[in-house]
Design a protein with these regions (language model features):
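Acidic/histidine-rich catalytic neighborhood
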Residues: 103-170
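Residues that flank catalytic or metal-binding motifs in active/ligand-binding sites
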Residues: 72, 124, 156, 232, ...
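Short, surface-exposed recognition loops and adjoining beta-strand edges that mediate ligand/DNA contacts
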Residues: 114-135, 215, 316, 340-354
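Beta-sheet entry/capping signal
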Residues: 42-49, 98, 105, 124-127, ...
Length: 436
């Protein structure tokens, strides 16, 4: 919804989360198994720590029993991050998003003597032990630490990484003002958190793949007819992309290709699987390009989607609504902090898009015709710097940028892994054109 520039559709989601967090989030945080947290000092009516393991209904009510999943509040918080990143709405940040995310993080990383936090530090790293990643804890009952149930699940590690990075970013930008010791705690946990779990496939042997958790180790692929939890580190955890370290990106690509997620069809993972395909894909040089992804996606659509566009998978309601993210990300990606134009689209196939919304509150349009990217236009809503990968990688020199009919200075900046990026300053409300 956000990348489609239809963020208003998500408007009803946020009050549901905020109402329950304010009403019961602190109670659950103080009562949670192995993770009691009686933190005070919350903002805007929010408890000092928030935690919930159930499905929520409007008006601060629950609509199901305890599912045991400790990551639910983290999961819910990701949409708050996405809404702010795509809009740069500082009122939403300070009044709604930051108070919630700060309280959710407190349950995990701690908030003083009355809230030690769920994570444990062992051998110099913070570990997540027994958070019951799957509904009902069918991986094993709740058990006292250090019983290794669900050790460092990909879901919790990735979601916590994304949450902490966001909190640190908005603090360093001066948009929020956490106490110095709290900011230091976030930075320490992020720097020393257990990594995304990676292991080896049973077949073919010695093939690195993403795992759903460090332990217990499942035979890969992890689940059939179920939700492949290892994908969540890619999306919506957003911790793996084309600029990730080669070893991690290779493991992610192997995971996508080996998991065979359409045979059998997965339980309720449509909205995670295909964005993950796209975000670790490539336009040339690997199997994960748009042609492969669209063919694979069409198998699921033909088998399980009705004439009204509703995908008949496990779960209920909007659990399986998520195909638009995958399609948009084939044309434009920005979750890594910079723009990528047609990141998985074969250059031999024409394509175009108009006013997709990118991180940084940019509205972006472009076309690909005859193997050449043209008509790149960026509307800046918030006046932030715009950083991008040149879609003319074989052209020497800086791309040209103009705004209001005048040239705009473009600077070369180093991206992750030595990636070459370009950056220019923007003014809020101004339209910019990028050309070779």
């Amino acid at each position: 919804m956000f990348s489609s520039n239809r963020g208003e559709i998500a408007g009803s989601f946020f009050p549901v989360i905020l109402d329950y967090a304010k009403r019961m989030g602190g109670v659950e945080a103080s009562e949670a198994v192995n993770g009691g947290c009686n933190a005070t000092g919350g903002l805007k009516g929010m408890p000092g720590a928030v935690h919930f393991t159930i499905q929520l209904a409007p008006l601060g009510l629950a609509n199901s029993g305890d599912l045991g999943i400790h990551s639910n509040a983290l999961f819910a918080g990701l949409n708050f991050i996405s809404r702010f990143e795509s809009s740069q709405n500082t009122t939403f940040l300070t009044e709604e998003s930051y108070p919630l995310l700060r309280a959710v993080a407190a349950w995990w990383v701690g908030a003083g003597d009355d809230c030690p936090g769920w994570l444990q530090k062992e051998d110099g790293r913070y570990i997540d032990n027994n958070t019951c990643t799957r509904e009902g804890c069918f991986n094993g009952p709740h058990a006292p630490k250090p019983n290794p149930k669900d050790l460092n699940p990909a879901i919790e590690i990735a979601f916590l990484m994304r949450t902490l990075r966001h909190l640190i970013d908005v603090a360093e930008r001066g948009l929020v003002s956490p106490p110095p010791e709290e900011l230091a705690r976030w930075q320490d946990v992020l720097a020393n958190l257990a990594p995304i779990p990676v292991g080896e496939a049973v077949s073919p042997p010695n093939t690195p793949v993403l795992l759903p958790q460090e332990a217990p180790v499942f035979t890969f692929p992890d689940e059939q007819h179920d939700n492949p939890l290892e994908f969540y580190a890619v999306y919506p955890g957003e911790q793996i992309g084309q600029s990730s370290p080669a070893s991690l990106l290779t493991a992610a690509r192997n995971t996508v290709l080996l998991a065979d997620v359409t045979t059998p069809l997965q339980e309720n993972a449509f909205q995670e699987i295909f964005p993950s395909f796209v975000r670790v894909g490539c336009a040339e040089g690997c199997d994960l390009n748009a042609s492969f992804i669209l063919t694979t996606m069409s198998h699921v659509v033909q088998a399980q989607m009705g004439a009204n566009g509703y995908l008949r998978q496990g779960g209920g309601g909007i659990e399986t609504a998520g195909g638009a993210v995958a399609v948009n990300d084939m044309l434009l990606q920005s979750f890594e902090g910079f723009l990528r134009f047609f990141p998985v689209w074969p250059r031999s196939e024409d394509a175009s898009f108009t006013t997709l919304r990118a991180v940084g509150a940019f509205l972006v349009s472009a076309s690909l015709k005859g193997g050449v990217v043209k008509g790149v236009e960026v509307v800046s809503e918030a006046g932030l710097n715009c950083t991008f990968v040149s879609p003319w990688e074989h052209t020497k020199g800086a791309p040209s940028v103009s705004g209001a009919g005048k040239p705009v200075a473009v600077a070369s900046v180093a991206g992750p892994g030595g990636l070459s990026l370009w950056r220019f300053e923007t003014l809020a409300g101004q339209t910019y054109r990028i050309a070779t």
